[in-house]
Regions:
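Enzymes that bind and transform nitrogen-containing heteroaromatic metabolites
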Residues: 1-63, 70, 114, 118
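Residue-level signal for inorganic ion chemistry
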Residues: 4, 65, 82, 133, ...
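Zn2+-dependent cytidine deaminase-like catalytic core
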Residues: 8, 13-16, 87-193
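A polyampholytic, Gly/Pro-enriched intrinsically disordered region
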Residues: 28-41, 175-186, 200-202
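Short beta-strand scaffold segments in enzyme catalytic cores
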Residues: 46, 80-89
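Secretory/periplasmic and organellar redox-cofactor proteins
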Residues: 50-57, 66, 171, 175-181, ...
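Short helix-to-loop capping/linker segments positioned immediately adjacent to catalytic or ligand/cofactor-binding
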Residues: 69-75
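Short, basic and Ser/Thr-rich N-terminal targeting/leader segments
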Residues: 77-81, 104
């Protein structure tokens, strides 16, 4: 959207459920966005930041994901990828390719840990060193499908998946599914270097 900030003022004297009170249905999920509340001349004013600058935070977690990818043993049939999940409540879960199974991708590993812990992933952000996959032969769901099914609101990665194995459409599918996708190509060279075993180089 075109709106970065929405400020809503409510008169405390208006009774909830009053049939004569004006109705307002926000065109977004208020719980997904940072908000500030204050009193101003008898009104309760709430300011929603719809598009906060998250560059510093994104780069912090993306670097963590890249560091995690180094734990994966190089394999001729897989990328070395790391992933970090941050929920709306601040819980964090990590994973990397083949961490617990030779068929698991990094995002899948992190999601499995989160669901096992009973975490609410609706509105969460997932940081992956590489674009989440859109096609899988070894598992019933691709990582992009898992992200959509669990209700993530943001996906952040450094490198679009190269066409070594398949033509990936993960970012396209996520955007079509309503997920915000942010890419930081300034970190892509490091991800390519980590995957040098597949002929990728910085």
């Amino acid at each position: 959207g075109l709106v970065d900030t929405l400020r809503m003022a409510v008169n405390p004297a208006v009774r909830v459920g009053d049939p004569h009170a004006p109705r307002f249905e926000p065109p977004f999920d208020p719980a997904r966005f940072p908000q500030q509340r204050r009193q101003l001349e008898g009104m309760e004013v709430t300011t929603y930041t719809l598009h906060p600058d998250r560059t510093e935070e994104d780069l912090h977690y993306l670097r963590q994901a890249i560091a995690l990818s180094r734990r994966c043993t190089p394999c001729a049939t897989s990328y070395r990828v790391g992933a970090v999940i941050v929920t709306r409540s601040g819980d964090r879960f990590t994973g990397y390719t083949h961490e617990t199974s030779p068929t698991h991708h990094a995002e899948q590993e992190a999601i499995l840990k989160a669901t096992a812990a009973g975490a609410d992933l609706h509105g969460a952000s997932i940081y992956s060193s590489m674009e989440p996959c859109s096609t899988r032969s070894s598992e019933p769901e691709s990582c992009s499908e898992l992200i959509l099914r669990h209700g993530f609101s943001r996906t952040v990665f450094a490198l679009y998946e190269p066409s070594c194995f398949v033509c990936c459409e993960g970012a396209v599918r996520l955007r079509k599914g309503g997920v915000e996708v942010r890419v930081y190509p300034q970190l892509a060279g490091e991800v390519r270097a980590i995957n040098g075993h597949l002929g990728l180089h910085e």
